[in-house]
Structure formats: C-alpha cells, structure tokens
Amino acid sequence: MQNLTVAILAGGKSSRMGQNKALLPLGTMKIIEHLVTNLRPIASELLLVANTDEYAFLNLPVYRDRFPGQGPLAGIETALRVAFNEKVYITACDLPLLPAEIPRFLAENTEDYDVTVLAYKGKIEPLIGIYRKSIYPVVEKHLILRKNKIIDFYPQVKVKIINFEQLPENLQREEFLLNVNTPADYEKLLKIFSLKE
C-alpha cells in the first residue's frame, strides 16, 4: 500500500518461551521471516524495533528503543518517531499467521481516526493497529511519565475499534490471531502450519 509504514516490534524478552520466539523455525523460515514476507506487499516502508543485532540477516532497518524496559509502548514510540509515513501499522513479532489483508482493511478504514485497532471477543488488540505519526507527542509523554500501558493513552486521541466480526468473512479465522508466547503456543502454531502446507 502506498504511504503505509509497517513496524514489527521484536523487543520483548520472550521470557515465557525461554528463547527468542521470533527466531524459532517455522517450515523453512523463522517466525519473523514469515511476518516480513506476509507484510512486505502492503508496506511502502518496513522496519523492525528491536534491542538486538540478531535480525541483521533480514536486511531491514532496525531501531532500538529510546525507553528500554518500558514494554511495547516504547516500541510504538520508536516506530512513530522514525516512520516516514503518517500511517504506521504496528504489530508484534509473534503473530506469524496474521494475513496482510487484516492491516490493509484497518488502514483502508482509518478515516480521520488517530488509532484504528482490532478487537477480538471484546478485548482490544493494540498490536494489531494503525497509529498516526501525529500522535507521537502523546505517546512520548506517557513514556516519560512511565505510564507504559498502551491503552492508557487512548482517551487522549481519537480511537476507532474494529471488531473481529466486522472484518470480511474470509478473514474471520481465529487462528490468524494466534500469539506465540509459550512452548504450547509454538506447538499449536506448528500443527496449524503443517496443515496449511
């Protein structure tokens, strides 16, 4: 898509997995490579936010957090600060099955909202969302105040929530939202992936 930055946040500690989940194998590639492959077609700019040099093999720009240790909101701050485009799709490195059509749908339906996020079963998914670069000062201020929860800044901006059921029917598959946080999640991912192949 024209004028869309895609930012993959890969700065987490992967503590529940015991190793870097983004680098776990999935078929012939690593999890993070699947994300990059899926999202590249919709990105006019593609970048990673990570505090490690382990992703050099992807040949993508990698930016480090300005507020290390302050969670995913710090990753959003970095992405908004460095992004070339006004619209920035923020996602996590542990959503390898999410098709690019979902962020494309969100981006096409942002209207004049500052944040457009997906919600599933009543729960907001802040790392499946389009964020406008113009809200950067609000995000930065929250981090300076050590208010690290993403949705805590939502009341200060215009937020549009798109429910899972509002997506086109072919995108309403629960497996697309599988977060790979634990060894059990990884086993589930491998099963789903082997069925797809």
From Swiss-Prot:
One GO cellular component term noted in the UniProt record for this chain: cytoplasm
Official protein name in the record: Probable molybdenum cofactor guanylyltransferase
GO biological process: Mo-molybdopterin cofactor biosynthetic process
Primary enzyme class: transferase
Cofactor annotation: Mg(2+)
UniProt catalytic activity: Mo-molybdopterin + GTP + H(+) = Mo-molybdopterin guanine dinucleotide + diphosphate
Principal subcellular localization: cytoplasm
Keywords, alphabetical: Cytoplasm, GTP-binding, Magnesium, Metal-binding, Molybdenum cofactor biosynthesis, Nucleotide-binding, Transferase
